[in-house]
Regions:
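Phosphate-binding chemistry for phosphorylated carbohydrates and sugar-nucleotides
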Residues: 3-165
Length: 168
């Protein structure tokens, strides 16, 4: 499913330099590889898990290292996962933080969504919902919790959803 999803991205990452902070966790091997397969030049940081250093001053809860690396390397984008890789935040080339709602909006703009539906929760940002609707996408709200979003996505074959707090 993970690599199948790469085919839904309208634009490849060719010529884009991406710093990815893997939080010394589950994303340490997968995230850099997915980005490389998508064509990105990848700089991986905090990608050496040893069983004790997960989330240690790195990842989506500690963005300082990512922001610094993006700025010093001239990267176009930075991505930060948490230790279990169920959360991602981004920073732009200047180090400005891009939160989960913005990421979902960007993905909706650049992804073929077969069901034309995005799943979120009753707490999803109203601005995001209005933005999706202006693009003729349907927004479906579930109760708060990744379980409910995932259940809705699986039951109705939706490809894009988020529960907030950068869980996309």
């Amino acid at each position: 499913m993970l690599f199948r999803s790469l085919g839904t991205i309208e634009r490849q990452f060719n010529g884009i330099k991406v710093v990815v902070d893997c939080a010394n966790g589950a994303a340490s091997y997968v995230a850099p590889e997915v980005l490389r397969r998508a064509g990105a030049e990848v700089i991986a940081i905090s990608n050496e898990p040893n069983g004790r250093n997960i989330n240690e001053n790195c990842g989506s809860t500690h963005l300082d290292n990512l922001i610094a690396k993006v700025r010093t390397t001239g990267a176009d984008l930075g991505l930060a996962h948490d230790g279990d890789a169920d959360r991602v935040l981004a920073v732009d080339n200047e180090g400005n933080v891009i939160d989960g709602d913005h990421i979902l909006g960007i993905l909706a703009d650049h992804t073929d969504i077969p069901t034309n539906t995005v799943v979120g929760t009753v707490m999803t940002n109203l601005g995001l919902i209005r933005s999706l609707e202006s693009r003729k996408l349907t927004f479906v709200a579930t109760p708060v919790g990744d379980r409910y979003v995932l259940e809705k996505m699986l039951a109705e074959d939706h490809m894009l959803g988020e529960i907030g707090r950068a869980h996309v």
